[in-house]
């Protein structure tokens, strides 16, 4: 086991604080509408330019191991805030730096670190309650657009696209962000349930110009196994022919004789029919077939349930207003499933999302949820160069998370003002002793840091701005860094999601509290006796 180096009390905290400052100073340059860019070297390809706090934090690794520990702890703040709220990473970093700085001073002057931490926790609890009480629910589309615009660093086009996407696919719908092949940013919305399986034979196509199968009001047969001959299906096929409605077959596979028979019947004009493979694999396939069945008010034909193909009747088949099948995907629009059944299934999937620990499973469950709950929107981000597209895509991702958070918990005035105003809740916090009161006061001073930093990044004097804001007591009165004007921030569209502000403060205080109560740090000693490099081989070239 390698020898370790240990640092104690003030020396440990000094080293740690230096690491915190290096990381936080790099990250906080990006805060606010006039925040600066950070350029990150890449081992291959062009450097990356970003204004995303968590992207900057993740790149920082320091040579000194003790400083690096401090930096990594604050990096954890940014990552945690990003995971929970999707935005607010820079605010969280600025708050953590402010609390650690003030806390370290108090500990050095002889305060009890544990009481300080208790005081910090009490203060954060009071401010969070105040923020929740003052959060305003989002009432219209323009407010969603404003949140998106603020989070995308003042890019109104991104805000507009996000608001339109959320309006069309609902708050639970999936919105994905991709890189476009062109210079323009565009929005594409797929309504209904779409899965990535196309027609099994091009002979099923009904619209030859677009190479697409289009059915109005079809029956949908959902079968779990392969279909290799149609003998067992004849009763249901005859019933469908008599109803003169189209039929879509979704099965694990349709092969050989069965596929040939379907194609021949289609070409002779006797049968409007198409077949596609079931989406997904293994257990996920079963779940997705069940989703389709619930959406279309059909039944999954499965031997596990004791249902045989021979005994299938028309009322076991699903129905939908429209089905469109292309080479690569199938879309079912307006299935006739009962609203209560679909809502029950959505609640079940939500519960699974809460319980799962795997990011991959969570992503797949969210896709299923969106397909049931409304649809999928794709924002394709365009730009002139690859570097520009990547930078813009970072901002769209941030803005997307921020708008979701705003819909969830409401909005607050932006620009760091909500935290400043919530400080009045600290007047009523009861503490057990003087050291805890100092902990509360640390938070009182620290919550000014985001507003100061936004002002400084915009070229103004932070202390002057904060002083002027303190003169007025209205909750939404603040300074707009974009225009340099004072006024009602709600009216000016300077708003932050309540969830983002709350999460940033809670995560910052949580990690900062741990750093303040640190008394010793242990790191591996650098080895001095490393072996010399191998000499070059002389006379060995054959």
UniProtKB/Swiss-Prot annotation:
Locations listed in the record: Cytoplasm
Protein name: Chaperonin GroEL 3
NCBIfam families in the cross-refs: GroEL, PRK00013.1, PRK12849.1, PRK12850.1, PRK12851.1
Catalytic activity: ATP + H2O + a folded polypeptide = ADP + phosphate + an unfolded polypeptide
Keywords, in A-Z order: ATP-binding, Chaperone, Cytoplasm, Isomerase, Nucleotide-binding, Plasmid
PANTHER family: 60 KDA HEAT SHOCK PROTEIN, MITOCHONDRIAL
Protein purpose: Together with its co-chaperonin GroES, plays an essential role in assisting protein folding. The GroEL-GroES system forms a nano-cage that allows encapsulation of the non-native substrate proteins and provides a physical environment optimized to promote and accelerate protein folding.
UniProt similarity note: Belongs to the chaperonin (HSP60) family.
Subunit structure: Forms a cylinder of 14 subunits composed of two heptameric rings stacked back-to-back. Interacts with the co-chaperonin GroES.
Entries under CDD domains matching the protein: GroEL (cd03344)
GO MF entries: ATP binding; ATP-dependent protein folding chaperone; isomerase activity; unfolded protein binding
EC number: 5.6.1.7
Main location (coarse class): cytoplasm
Binding site for ATP: 30-33, 51, 87-91, 415, 496
SUPFAM superfamilies attached to this UniProt entry: GroEL apical domain-like (SSF52029), GroEL equatorial domain-like (SSF48592), GroEL-intermediate domain like (SSF54849)
């Amino acid at each position: 086991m390698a020898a370790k180096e240990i640092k104690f009390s003030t020396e440990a905290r000094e080293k740690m604080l230096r690491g915190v400052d290096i990381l936080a100073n790099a990250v906080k340059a990006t805060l606010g509408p006039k925040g600066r860019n950070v350029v990150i070297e890449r081992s291959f390809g062009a450097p990356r330019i970003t204004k995303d706090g968590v992207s900057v934090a993740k790149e920082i690794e320091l040579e000194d191991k003790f400083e690096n520990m401090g930096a990594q702890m604050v990096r954890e703040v940014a990552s945690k805030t990003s995971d929970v709220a999707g935005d607010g990473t820079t605010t969280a970093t600025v708050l953590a730096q402010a609390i650690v700085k003030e806390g370290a001073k108090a500990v050095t002057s002889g305060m009890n670190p544990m009481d300080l931490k208790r005081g910090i926790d009490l203060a954060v609890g009071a401010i969070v309650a105040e923020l929740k009480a003052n959060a305003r629910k989002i009432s219209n589309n323009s407010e969603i657009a404003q949140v998106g615009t603020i989070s995308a660093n003042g890019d109104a086009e991104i805000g507009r696209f996000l608001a339109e996407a959320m309006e069309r696919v609902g708050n639970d719908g999936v919105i994905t962000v991709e890189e476009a092949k062109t210079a323009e940013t565009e929005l594409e919305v797929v309504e209904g349930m779409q899965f990535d399986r196309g027609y099994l034979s091009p002979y099923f196509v009904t619209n030859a110009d677009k190479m697409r199968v289009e059915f109005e009001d079809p029956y949908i047969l959902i079968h779990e196994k392969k279909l290799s001959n149609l003998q067992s299906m004849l009763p249901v096929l005859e019933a469908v022919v008599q109803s003169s409605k189209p039929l879509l077959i979704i099965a694990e596979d349709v092969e050989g004789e069965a596929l040939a028979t379907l194609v021949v019947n289609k070409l002779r004009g006797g049968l409007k029919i198409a077949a596609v493979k079931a989406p997904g694999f293994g257990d996920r396939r079963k779940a997705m077939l069940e989703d389709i069945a619930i959406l279309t008010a059909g039944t999954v034909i499965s031997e596990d349930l004791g249902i045989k193909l021979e005994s299938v009747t028309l009322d076991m088949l699903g129905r939908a207003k429209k089905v469109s099948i292309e080479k690569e995907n199938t879309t079912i629009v307006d299935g006739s499933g009962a609203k209560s059944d679909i809502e029950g299934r959505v609640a079940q999937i939500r519960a699974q999302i809460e319980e799962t620990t795997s990011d991959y499973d969570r992503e797949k469950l969210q896709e299923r949820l969106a397909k049931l709950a409304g649809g999928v929107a794709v924002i394709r981000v365009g730009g002139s160069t690859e570097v520009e597209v990547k930078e813009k895509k970072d901002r769209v991702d941030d803005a997307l998370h921020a708008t979701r958070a705003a819909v969830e918990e409401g909005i607050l005035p932006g620009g760091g003002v909500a935290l400043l105003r919530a400080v009045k809740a600290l007047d009523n916090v009861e503490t057990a002793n003087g050291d805890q009161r100092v902990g509360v006061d640390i938070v009182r001073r620290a919550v000014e840091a985001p507003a100061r930093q936004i002002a400084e990044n915009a070229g103004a004097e932070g202390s002057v701005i904060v002083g002027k804001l303190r003169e007025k007591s209205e909750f939404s009165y603040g300074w707009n860094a974009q225009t340099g004007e004072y006024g009602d921030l709600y009216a000016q569209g300077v708003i932050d999601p309540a969830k983002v502000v709350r999460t940033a403060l809670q995560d910052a205080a949580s990690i900062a509290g741990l750093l303040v109560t640190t008394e010793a740090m242990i790191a591996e000693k650098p080895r001095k006796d490393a072996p010399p490099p191998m000499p070059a081989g002389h006379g060995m070239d054959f």
